[in-house]
Amino acid sequence: MVFDPRTLDQPKDISAYRDQRYQGSVRDQELALRTSCTLYVGNLSYYTKEDQVYELFGRAGDVRRVIMGLDRFKKTPCGFCFVEYYTREDAELALQNISNTRMDDRVIRADWDAGFVEGRQYGRGKHGGQVRDEYRKDYDPERGGYNRAIAQKSMVE
Protein backbone atom coordinates (compact mmCIF):
# COMPACT_ATOMS: atom_id res chain seq x y z
CA MET A 1 0.00 0.00 0.00
CA VAL A 2 1.40 3.39 -1.01
CA PHE A 3 1.07 6.26 1.44
CA ASP A 4 -0.73 9.26 -0.08
CA PRO A 5 -0.92 12.36 2.18
CA ARG A 6 -3.89 13.66 0.15
CA THR A 7 -6.07 10.96 1.77
CA LEU A 8 -5.61 12.35 5.28
CA ASP A 9 -8.70 14.57 5.47
CA GLN A 10 -10.77 12.02 7.40
CA PRO A 11 -9.72 9.73 10.28
CA LYS A 12 -8.73 6.26 9.09
CA ASP A 13 -8.27 2.95 10.83
CA ILE A 14 -4.54 3.29 11.47
CA SER A 15 -5.21 3.68 15.20
CA ALA A 16 -8.19 3.07 17.45
CA TYR A 17 -6.55 5.36 20.01
CA ARG A 18 -6.86 9.10 19.48
CA ASP A 19 -5.42 11.83 21.68
CA GLN A 20 -8.47 14.02 22.23
CA ARG A 21 -6.23 16.96 23.12
CA TYR A 22 -4.04 16.74 20.02
CA GLN A 23 -2.96 20.24 19.00
CA GLY A 24 -3.53 20.19 15.26
CA SER A 25 -5.97 19.18 12.56
CA VAL A 26 -7.31 15.70 11.92
CA ARG A 27 -5.07 15.63 8.86
CA ASP A 28 -2.01 16.55 10.95
CA GLN A 29 -2.81 13.87 13.50
CA GLU A 30 -3.36 11.25 10.81
CA LEU A 31 -0.03 12.12 9.19
CA ALA A 32 1.70 11.94 12.58
CA LEU A 33 0.14 8.51 13.23
CA ARG A 34 1.29 7.22 9.84
CA THR A 35 4.88 8.35 10.36
CA SER A 36 5.29 7.96 14.13
CA CYS A 37 7.70 5.61 15.89
CA THR A 38 5.70 5.86 19.14
CA LEU A 39 3.22 3.38 20.59
CA TYR A 40 0.62 3.96 23.28
CA VAL A 41 0.44 0.92 25.57
CA GLY A 42 -2.56 0.49 27.84
CA ASN A 43 -4.03 -1.91 30.38
CA LEU A 44 -0.75 -2.20 32.27
CA SER A 45 -0.77 -3.21 35.90
CA TYR A 46 -0.08 -0.33 38.26
CA TYR A 47 2.85 -2.46 39.43
CA THR A 48 4.51 -2.85 36.01
CA LYS A 49 7.99 -1.34 36.04
CA GLU A 50 9.71 0.61 33.28
CA ASP A 51 12.46 -2.01 32.90
CA GLN A 52 9.80 -4.70 32.25
CA VAL A 53 8.41 -2.59 29.41
CA TYR A 54 11.92 -2.08 27.98
CA GLU A 55 12.57 -5.82 28.17
CA LEU A 56 9.35 -6.86 26.42
CA PHE A 57 9.23 -4.17 23.75
CA GLY A 58 12.98 -4.40 23.19
CA ARG A 59 12.38 -7.82 21.64
CA ALA A 60 10.94 -6.03 18.59
CA GLY A 61 13.82 -3.57 18.13
CA ASP A 62 15.80 -0.75 19.66
CA VAL A 63 13.65 1.22 22.10
CA ARG A 64 14.56 4.91 22.28
CA ARG A 65 12.67 5.51 25.54
CA VAL A 66 9.71 4.46 27.65
CA ILE A 67 7.52 7.09 29.30
CA MET A 68 5.42 5.61 32.10
CA GLY A 69 1.95 7.07 32.66
CA LEU A 70 1.54 8.68 36.07
CA ASP A 71 -1.36 9.67 38.25
CA ARG A 72 -1.60 13.43 37.87
CA PHE A 73 -1.83 14.02 41.62
CA LYS A 74 0.11 11.20 43.28
CA LYS A 75 2.78 10.80 40.56
CA THR A 76 2.40 7.01 40.82
CA PRO A 77 1.96 4.62 37.83
CA CYS A 78 -1.58 4.52 36.47
CA GLY A 79 -1.62 1.75 33.89
CA PHE A 80 -0.28 3.10 30.59
CA CYS A 81 2.94 4.14 28.92
CA PHE A 82 4.41 5.36 25.67
CA VAL A 83 7.14 3.37 23.92
CA GLU A 84 9.30 5.24 21.41
CA TYR A 85 11.40 3.35 18.88
CA TYR A 86 14.20 4.65 16.71
CA THR A 87 12.52 3.31 13.55
CA ARG A 88 8.97 2.89 12.31
CA GLU A 89 9.79 -0.68 11.27
CA ASP A 90 10.66 -1.70 14.84
CA ALA A 91 7.48 -0.05 16.14
CA GLU A 92 5.41 -1.92 13.51
CA LEU A 93 7.02 -5.20 14.53
CA ALA A 94 6.17 -4.52 18.18
CA LEU A 95 2.59 -3.60 17.33
CA GLN A 96 2.11 -6.79 15.32
CA ASN A 97 3.76 -9.15 17.79
CA ILE A 98 3.42 -7.68 21.28
CA SER A 99 -0.01 -6.04 21.38
CA ASN A 100 -2.58 -8.34 23.01
CA THR A 101 0.11 -10.34 24.83
CA ARG A 102 0.40 -10.71 28.59
CA MET A 103 2.50 -8.65 30.96
CA ASP A 104 2.05 -9.05 34.73
CA ASP A 105 -0.92 -11.36 34.06
CA ARG A 106 -2.74 -8.66 32.06
CA VAL A 107 -3.49 -8.51 28.34
CA ILE A 108 -1.89 -5.28 27.21
CA ARG A 109 -3.12 -3.10 24.35
CA ALA A 110 -0.74 -1.28 22.05
CA ASP A 111 -1.66 1.19 19.34
CA TRP A 112 -0.06 3.95 17.30
CA ASP A 113 0.45 7.28 18.98
CA ALA A 114 1.08 10.58 17.19
CA GLY A 115 4.17 11.17 19.32
CA PHE A 116 4.82 11.93 22.95
CA VAL A 117 4.52 15.53 24.12
CA GLU A 118 5.55 16.56 27.64
CA GLY A 119 2.56 16.48 29.97
CA ARG A 120 0.84 13.53 28.29
CA GLN A 121 2.37 11.14 30.81
CA TYR A 122 -0.19 12.28 33.37
CA GLY A 123 -3.60 10.64 33.69
CA ARG A 124 -6.53 12.79 32.58
CA GLY A 125 -9.21 11.30 34.79
CA LYS A 126 -11.03 13.36 37.40
CA HIS A 127 -9.11 11.60 40.18
CA GLY A 128 -5.71 11.83 38.44
CA GLY A 129 -5.56 8.39 36.80
CA GLN A 130 -6.91 7.21 33.49
CA VAL A 131 -10.44 8.14 32.44
CA ARG A 132 -11.10 4.49 31.51
CA ASP A 133 -10.52 3.40 35.11
CA GLU A 134 -13.16 5.80 36.39
CA TYR A 135 -15.85 3.84 34.54
CA ARG A 136 -14.67 0.42 35.70
CA LYS A 137 -17.19 -1.27 38.00
CA ASP A 138 -15.33 -4.49 38.76
CA TYR A 139 -12.63 -5.05 41.34
CA ASP A 140 -9.17 -5.08 39.73
CA PRO A 141 -6.33 -5.43 42.25
CA GLU A 142 -3.69 -4.84 39.57
CA ARG A 143 -5.19 -1.44 38.81
CA GLY A 144 -5.83 -0.21 42.33
CA GLY A 145 -8.99 -2.17 43.25
CA TYR A 146 -12.32 -0.49 42.53
CA ASN A 147 -12.42 2.80 40.68
CA ARG A 148 -11.92 5.74 43.01
CA ALA A 149 -15.45 7.12 42.71
CA ILE A 150 -16.96 3.77 43.77
CA ALA A 151 -14.39 3.37 46.56
CA GLN A 152 -15.14 6.85 47.93
CA LYS A 153 -18.89 6.28 47.72
CA SER A 154 -18.67 2.97 49.63
CA MET A 155 -16.55 4.62 52.36
CA VAL A 156 -19.28 7.23 52.90
CA GLU A 157 -22.06 4.62 53.17
From Swiss-Prot:
GO terms for molecular function: RNA cap binding. GO terms for biological process: mRNA cis splicing, via spliceosome; mRNA splicing, via spliceosome; regulatory ncRNA-mediated gene silencing. It is found in: Nucleus. It holds the Pfam family RRM_1. CDD domains: RRM_NCBP2 (cd12240). Gene3D superfamilies: 3.30.70.330. InterPro entries: NCBP2, NCBP2_RRM, Nucleotide-bd_a/b_plait_sf, RBD_domain_sf, RRM_dom. Component of the nuclear cap-binding complex (CBC), a heterodimer composed of ncbp-1 and ncbp-2 that interacts with m7GpppG-capped RNA. Belongs to the RRM NCBP2 family. Component of the cap-binding complex (CBC), which binds co-transcriptionally to the 5' cap of pre-mRNAs and is involved in various processes such as pre-mRNA splicing and RNA-mediated gene silencing (RNAi). The CBC complex is involved in miRNA-mediated RNA interference and is required for primary microRNAs (miRNAs) processing. In the CBC complex, ncbp-2 recognizes and binds capped RNAs (m7GpppG-capped RNA) but requires ncbp-1 to stabilize the movement of its N-terminal loop and lock the CBC into a high affinity cap-binding state with the cap structure. This is Nuclear cap-binding protein subunit 2. It comes from Caenorhabditis briggsae.
